[in-house]
C-alpha cells in the first residue's frame, strides 16, 4: 500500500535520487594548472659566490671515490 500520494504533480521533488535521475551529474569546472616558477639566474662565476660551493664539493668528492679504483 502506498504511503502517501501527492495531490498534484508539482508537489513531487524534481530529483528524488542521484542514482535514479536521468540527468547527468554536473562536472566541476577545470582549474588551470599552476606554471612552474622561473629559475633564478646565477650572478657570480665562482661557486662560492653563487652558493653552489657545496654542490661542487659533492660532485668532486663523488668523482674522487672508490669508483676510479681498478
Swiss-Prot record:
GO terms for biological process: defense response to Gram-negative bacterium; defense response to Gram-positive bacterium. One of its GO terms (cellular component) is nucleus. Residues 46-57 have a biased composition (Basic and acidic residues). The record marks 67-68 as: Cleavage. InterPro entries: HMGN_fam. One of its GO terms (molecular function) is nucleosomal DNA binding. It comes from the Eukaryota. It holds the Pfam family HMG14_17. Keywords: Antibiotic, Antimicrobial, DNA-binding, Nucleus, Secreted. Its main location: nucleus. It is found in: Nucleus. Residues 30-45 have a biased composition (Basic residues). Residues 1-70 are annotated as: Disordered. Coiled coil: none annotated. Belongs to the HMGN family. Non-histone protein that probably binds to the inner side of nucleosomal DNA, altering the association between the DNA and the nucleosome octamer. This is Non-histone chromosomal protein H6.
Amino acid at each position: 500500500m502506498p504511503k502517501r500520494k501527492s495531490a498534484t504533480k508539482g508537489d513531487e521533488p524534481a530529483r528524488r535520487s542521484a542514482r535514479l535521475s536521468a540527468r547527468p551529474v554536473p562536472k566541476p569546472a577545470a582549474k588551470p594548472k599552476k606554471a612552474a616558477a622561473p629559475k633564478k639566474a646565477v650572478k657570480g662565476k665562482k661557486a662560492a659566490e653563487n652558493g653552489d660551493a657545496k654542490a661542487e664539493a659533492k660532485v668532486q668528492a663523488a668523482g674522487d671515490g672508490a669508483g676510479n679504483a681498478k
